[in-house]
Amino acid sequence: MDDLVRWKNRNDRKPLILLGARQVGKTYILKEFGRREYDNVAYINCDNNALVRDLFTPDYNIGRILLTIGAITGVNIQPGKTLIIMDEVQELKRGLASLKYFCEDAPQYHVAVAGSLLGLTLHDGDSYPVGKVNTLNMYPMTFEEFLLARNRKQMVDLLQAQRWDFVKGLRTLYIQHLREYYLVGGMPEAVDKFVQTNDANLVREVQNEILAAYEKDISKHAPAEQVMRIGQVWHSIPSQLAKENRKFIYGVVKKGARAKDYELAIQWLLDAGLVYKVNRVTTLAMPLKIHEEISAFKLFMLDCGLLGAMSLTPPAMLLLPSTDNSGKGDFTENFVCSQMKSLSDLPVFYYSKDNSQLELDFVVQANTAVCPVEVKAEENLQSKSLKTTLSENPDMHGLRFSMSDYREEGRLTNVPLYGARSFLKALKQ
């Protein structure tokens, strides 16, 4: 919501495209933003409203378009006082292209659009209004937002204030809710179902419905020649993450598979917002981006709850502590990745050396510092790779996320997993 308010108040504001996977709550957040920040909202759904089907077909005359939207919605549209929302805009012919004319001819009007798979238009030069729009990315609910949904605002406040002394006293409760988050994830409908019923089976039903909707999107919207390959990559992710080093291996998708056969499939999943890609760096030096190796990467699911549903992981396995970490490392690393990615301006990579066992789960660039990161599912804090990295780089400070309490150990900081996002957000400011 804060990002939307900042967009509203920008002097150079342009029409807004809100990107994000299906069912992360884009429509809800735009309507709520309009309710809080504007006198009224003119909302149209371009997918199920026959009246708007030909809205942009005659021309891009903004005066005519505004009169039509006002007539359809019954809203008196006023510059700066009305939020115009066009939902599922990808279903409306020439809908995205119209944003160029709102930007050039009527910048005083506040226009926001959303839709499923809008990210796929980023590479469509014919319809995407390059340079004429602002974009924001929306992600599944973070762990902190999950806590708020569970009516735990004080626990969120303690994490955001970095009050680790008080956080320690609530350790058992934080861990309980974190394990719940591993099961439920951050898809708003799944979170709401859990809050209302506390029933893991009903949550799984919601998650399976979301996964089915994604499958339908793949078959309906992906290029016909890529549908099978996209499905193969998508279904391979749980197996990819179950491997010890999580690196994406094409042979796991299909025996004998090659990169060139699946590059477009992976890009489609990225553009649809269904996966996160974390590339390898081969050197721990600023800026990390110039040391990026795009051919070596990890693929994570957008949501750990959906990962559990797709992998058929029993809910009890996620809700209870494990003694051997089996089946937990993948969820834990996926969780940390999703919390990092929700901080959209935080560069995230992983690090490994050729012909070496040394590998760091993540490497982040926070301001002018390179921070190596290790992730531990429980409280086994042995971390040979991180220890070696810090020994070889005496000016570097390392991070370890685990179930243990916050503590400083020389140039290594242990942060409890439930405080990972709060800590990283503070670190990059």
Spans of features found by a protein language model:
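Pre-Walker A adenine-sensing motif
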Residues: 1-11
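Accessory nucleic acid-recognition modules appended to NTPase machines
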Residues: 195-359, 363-366
